[in-house]
Amino acid sequence: QVVYTAAIHPDNPEYAQAVRAGIPMMARAELLGQIMANYKTAVNIAGTHGKTTTTSMLSEILLAADADPTISVGGILKDIGGNIRIGRSDLFVTEACEYTNSFLSFNPTMNIILNVKEDHLDFFKDLADIRASFRRFVERLPEGGTLIINSDIEDYEYFFKGLNVKVITVGSDPDKSTYSARGIAYDDLGRCHYTLLKNGEPYGIGEESSIDLMVPGIHNVYNSLAAIAAALELDIPIAAIKKGLAEFYGTNRRFERKGVFNG
């Protein structure tokens, strides 16, 4: 059987030869959907951007907690030596791409939506078409499944309105976000420190709410909030969450440090 990605089109020579030879064909998204259907918990991380980083953040947290997850990520995560890890637990974590509606082949129990913006307009007609695809992605959740969504997305309630799912929000506004950040500060490399809020109040006791990131930028604050929300929903201790985030230095080709010019 030949498995092909959304980047491969029917005019690809190898694809065309497989068709001529009568070899069974399967889209990569369909294969992933079949695999995750065998897991009790399947976490899908979607969004126009931030998927690889957030999937990697959550993976580092789960590894720090010895949760032994199976991981499929769209970049190279150094701590697993690639982009795939086969675990022995009943937990599957993957990034979920909207291109060609690939994520509609998945079988999630928890979905994360980081943002929804104009992208892949060679496939989607417009932003409304993209939003409709993400709505169908949420509809893939089972009754009582969990949706973690950024409340900064315009009309974010559209994505879950009328559905029987548990909704957890993250974002910049503590008044409409289950999890948000306060006192965001940066070091000289742009790496972030912040206080984690739950329903507008510092999370936990003492230093439990103090979060340190080793990756720069405000966007990674929001990526980390989504990863934290997912981890807490999976009953991961806050100590493991803090440890995993503090040990995450990014993935290859995502603002990757390559060296110092004339250094």
List PLM regions with ranges.
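Cytosolic ligand/metal-binding cores
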Residues: 2
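Phosphate-binding loop of NTP-binding sites
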Residues: 6-151, 155-166, 225, 229-234, ...
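Adenine nucleotide phosphate-binding catalytic loops in nucleotide-utilizing enzymes
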Residues: 124-131, 145, 161-263
